[in-house]
Amino acid sequence: MAGSLSEIKAKIISTEKTSKITSAMRMVSSAKLVKSEQAARDFQIYASKIRQITTDLLKSDLTTGSDNPMLVSRPVKKTGYIVITSDKGLVGGYNSKILKSIMDMIQEYHAAGDYEIISIGSIGSDFFKARGMNVAFELRGLADQPSFDQVGRIISQSVGMFVNEIFDELYVCYNHHVNSLTSQVRVQRMLPISDLVAEEAAEEGVTGFELEPNRHVILEQLLPQFTESLIYGAIIDAKTAEHAAGMTAMQTATDNAKHVINDLTIQYNRARQAAITQEITEIVAGANALE
């Protein structure tokens, strides 16, 4: 019985230590989430403005025609997917949701292998490579608050593959941050961008920008920046969802640890009570034997 009590006590102490670790990790993820949400809000100001300007320029350029490859829809022979996952685990179902979605899409539409994957995040890279899938580029070790300098190269490479007709359309697959408890898998078509902006161009009025030397020349310079901003925004969004998932996972782990501690404490008290009762019974039995 003494051995049983010591074993239960050791489990309680071990679980308490684990609970402290997961609680600390939850607080770290919470702090990262606050920073990411602020970064997303700040970036949205820039993203909204560049979208407005691009939409305005496209209104006239789409009607006059354009040979810019980023605007041209061509027969789809191969598709590119930028897939954003985390570099580490302990984020609940964050990675499994996005990986399941991309696998379902590939199995349904690309049985012949007519796709290329640009992987951001070690979890996704290892997952795809273990299955012998087509990974064109990868980026590991993404910062908690990723700067454009860190991701700019892989974004430019992705856009360049479309422009050079290595693939004919480009999607970004990531977890969209809704709130601290919820994220949604989002598969967003980035290129060609004519469809992406056409609806807004049809609905909104002309903003009346006066640009030099002319709208067409400015648009040629602006389109790559606009597309890169969309992809970068998706990366920030995904990173925010990752921090939220990490915070939720660690909160769940902490709560579960507390439940385990409570159960073990009850088990310990019952075992201790049984041991005391047994000792009293043995003492009484011994006293009766002496009479």
UniProtKB/Swiss-Prot annotation:
Record flagged with keyword Nucleotide-binding: no
Entry membrane topology: Peripheral membrane protein
Subunit organization: F-type ATPases have 2 components, CF(1) - the catalytic core - and CF(0) - the membrane proton channel. CF(1) has five subunits: alpha(3), beta(3), gamma(1), delta(1), epsilon(1). CF(0) has three main subunits: a, b and c.
GO cellular component, one term: plasma membrane
Descriptive protein name: ATP synthase gamma chain
Localization per Swiss-Prot or TrEMBL: Cell membrane
tRNA-binding keyword on record: no
Reported function: Produces ATP from ADP in the presence of a proton gradient across the membrane. The gamma chain is believed to be important in regulating ATPase activity and the flow of protons through the CF(0) complex.
Family per record: Belongs to the ATPase gamma chain family.
